[in-house]
Design a protein with these regions (language model features):
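Bacterial carbohydrate/catabolite-sensing allosteric modules
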Residues: 4, 10, 41-44, 49, ...
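N-terminal helix-turn-helix DNA-binding module of bacterial transcription factors
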Residues: 1-56
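Short boundary motifs at domain starts and secondary-structure transition points
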Residues: 54-61, 118-119
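Surface-exposed acidic loop/strand-edge motifs in secreted or periplasmic proteins
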Residues: 108
Length: 341
């Protein structure tokens, strides 16, 4: 097997030129690149994959050690940090950047449409959009400023689907796996799957994935989808749904798709004097303040907001690392999570 030295000798160049060819052939003259390429194919040389070094700021391309959190107004700061699930999301983003000693600053678009001068590539390494201006002209100016900066959009931004940025979908199968694992860790043997609100989506990917994962792990499940006529009044709907649920024997887990269903059913159970703390449950859309309404509640997962925050931070680091090669902005968004409490 030929090595770099032999290839360099046959091509009549030095080893540094051959090394540059393998790193990026555009750094080598076209005629030299063709000569080296022909020799490589002739001798059957295969470049061994280099072991990736530690993920240091220098390797990633961090220069300013500063990332901006873009908000539409100052009131959003108080709103986000008083909202339990979203607070965990943003805190997770902060924690990931702190591991690399990267600070985060708020960049607030003024009510008059002014955009802080700090939002520029000479001041920050990247940006995380939590909310955007509703005025089209201001949003367009903001996008123009962001196109020179590595940027990640988030599910917190109500306008994230109204622009030309790429979309990275959050895998609903992963939520299903975590849900089933959650019940398994609690030693729950049987769960009840509550339908989408008013049975609008009978073949929800999240529920289908949860069924498959429960079957694999060995957790029995009962699906209440279709068990109650969706056309009955809402209060009657939850009463009948609760009636069906209470007939399921040995059910220790409750899997909700919407927090509206969870709120309706748990209210009905509590009105009947049933202690809901005996159940382990999860809701795909449940946020902490919804659960706090019931006082002390059993363990739950609240849509993986923390994991989504970690994913957002890592996505931005990837964007900073490859920004020169892929100058595009990406959106971290989960269709299943769009209906936030």
């Amino acid at each position: 097997m030929a090595n770099l030295k032999e290839i360099a000798e046959r091509a009549g160049v030095n080893i540094a030129t051959v090394s540059r060819f393998f790193n990026n052939r555009k750094l080598v003259k076209a005629s030299t690149a063709e000569k080296i390429d022909a020799i490589v194919k002739e001798v059957g040389y295969q470049q061994r994959a280099r072991r990736q070094g530690p993920r240091t700021p220098d390797r990633i391309g961090i220069r300013h050690f500063r990332v901006m959190i873009v908000l539409n107004s100052a009131s959003n700061i108080e709103h986000y940090f008083h909202w339990g699930a979203v607070s965990r999301f943003i805190s997770a983003v902060f924690d990931e950047f702190q591991k690399l000693d990267i600070s985060m600053e708020f960049c607030i678009v003024g009510e008059d449409g002014s955009i802080p001068e700090r939002l520029n590539p000479d001041y920050c390494d990247g940006a995380v959009i939590c909310s955007e201006p509703v005025q089209p002209e201001v949003r367009e100016r903001l996008h123009q400023r962001l196109h020179g900066i590595s940027t990640v959009n988030t599910i917190l931004n109500a306008n994230c689907e109204n622009n030309d940025f790429d979309v990275v979908k959050f895998d609903s199968a992963e939520i299903s796996r975590l849900t089933a694992r959650f019940f398994a860790e609690k030693d729950v043997k049987e769960i009840v799957l509550f339908p989408e609100l008013k049975v609008r989506f009978k073949h929800n990917e999240l529920i289908d994935g949860l069924k498959q994962e429960c079957d694999r792990i060995g957790i029995r499940w009962t699906d209440l989808t279709g068990s109650v006529d969706a056309d009955v009044p809402m209060n009657e709907y939850y009463k009948k749904l609760s009636d069906v649920f209470l007939k399921v024997e040995n059910a220790a887990g409750m899997a909700f798709i919407t927090s509206a269903d969870m709120l309706g059913v748990l209210n009905e159970l509590r009105a009947r004097g049933i202690d809901i703390r005996q159940y382990e449950y999860i809701s795909a859309f449940a946020c902490e303040h919804t659960l706090r309404y019931f006082g002390k509640v059993p363990p739950f997962i609240d849509v993986k907001h923390k994991e989504l925050g970690i994913m957002t931070a890592k996505r931005l680091l990837d964007r900073i690392h490859s920004f020169n090669r892929l100058p595009r902005t990406e959106i971290v968004i989960a269709p299943e999570l769009r209906l936030l409490d």
